[in-house]
Amino acid sequence: MIIAVPSKNRAGRTTTQKVLPNCTFFVPESEVHQYEQFIKNVVAVPMTIRGITPTRNWILRNCNEKNVVFIDDDVKYCGYLRLDERKCKKIEIRDEQFWIEEFAKFFSMCEELKYKMWGVRTESSPRAAYPYKPILFRTYLTASCMGLINDGEYMFDESYVVKEDYEICLRHIRDKGGILGIRYLHWENEHWSTEGGCKDYRTIDVERQAIKKLIKEYPSMISSAKRTNNEFCIKLNL
């Protein structure tokens, strides 16, 4: 198993390595020397590979691992929510071994279910927690924390500049009848508040075009898409 962290223009400002010090950062070859000052494991991605979607596919083709975990480089909160009688509390888990063991369990569950991917909830808000539904099989996943069985059956669609994780998720549900959504843990990232990475090219227009393409390809699986502040919120019909 490899924990793959695509990153760009964020040397010295990433946080994921603080939780997962043995993860592997995949960065443009021109930035390797910058990242090596802060990161234990750094792999150079050729400069001919441009954009997050081709980068993900390059990782899948070149990492020589069957089980690949994609994680963003800017983790903010990771752990679970403890629900008490009148309030809830965020419990942080920053123990690398805990996460490695959990990721291994998720891959094992996928094998038993005949699925090829799993994902952890990517927001820590209490309103997003459903204690009676710790695992969902008809839900969305994002590549902020996503595991993929790398046997060649599923690759990211490079016609999607963004929302490539939504597309592969919907394709998997269409093909396999479900997907493994882990909801009793969360892995939340900074995203828009951190310079570099996808923020360099993820514009409202780029997002809008990707969503239009998703709706065209999976019309019965998307019920609505609304813009909230800097992001689009996609409501799925699963």
Q: What positions do the PLM features span?
A:
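A short acidic (Asp/Glu
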Residues: 14-16, 35-37, 79-82, 128-134, ...
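Short beta->alpha connector loops
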Residues: 7-12, 50, 150-152
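Active-site-proximal specificity loops/subdomain of glycosyltransferases
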Residues: 27-71, 76-91
